[in-house]
Amino acid sequence: MRYLITGGGTGGHIYPALSIANEIKNRHEDAEILYVGTEQGLEAKLVPREGFQFKTIRVKGMPRKINKESFIAMKELFLGLRDSKKIIEEFKPDVVIGTGGYVCGPVVYKAAKKKIPTLIHEQNAFPGMTNKILSRYVNRVMITFQESEKYFKYPEKIVLTGNPIRRDIIEIDIKKAYEDLNISPNVPLIISFGG
């Protein structure tokens, strides 16, 4: 099968997409996976490093207020729709999976309009604008938190999946991690992170 995966801008969209891609590869060695992102997004560095085929579209985030940037973003959106159509026609995916971020908007939308099975995954309790818009067109909306269900208008499409996690996080060698980070296992450690 051919899988087109898209999502980007931040690690919060990219790493779950890569987790999904890697799990597909683990379960189906013959799967063909294409990741679509933007040239300027973090995905342009991370995806090729993971060994996946990577293509780009032209698209920018839509400003919340109407201004000069809104018109530039609209132009880029139309270019992104055209780029997405071309990539979909060339790759011929069996399924398209989006993990959020403005880049997945044109890709998932074009795939849905071509009647290709489409899924989106929302990693946050409060869904992003792109996924809320796309939920109208896709076949399934996968959510991490039950609380986010109330923000989507199509409850029949929702599947609670949790958040995809990279195997290297799950299968970590704790002793080696302490050594690599030069941390004593006998000293309390506080980790703080966020997005």
Residue locations for each model-derived region?
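Glycine-rich beta-strand-to-loop/alpha-helix junction loops that act as flexible
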Residues: G7-T10, T99-G101, S192-G195
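Glycine-rich, highly charged phosphate/nucleotide-binding loops
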Residues: I72-E89, I172-K176
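Short amphipathic alpha-helix
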Residues: H13-I24
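Conserved nucleotide-sugar phosphate-binding/catalytic loop shared by glycosyltransferases and other
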Residues: Y3-G7, D30-L81, T161-P164
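Active-site-proximal region of nucleotide-activated glycan assembly enzymes
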Residues: I5, L34, L42, Q53, ...
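Residue-level signature of catalytic and energy-coupling elements of molecular machines
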Residues: G12, V47, G100, A125, ...
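Nucleotide-sugar donor-binding and catalytic loop/hinge architecture
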Residues: M1, D173-S192
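Glycosyltransferases and closely related glycan-assembly transferases
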Residues: D83-V96, C104-L119, K132-R136, R140
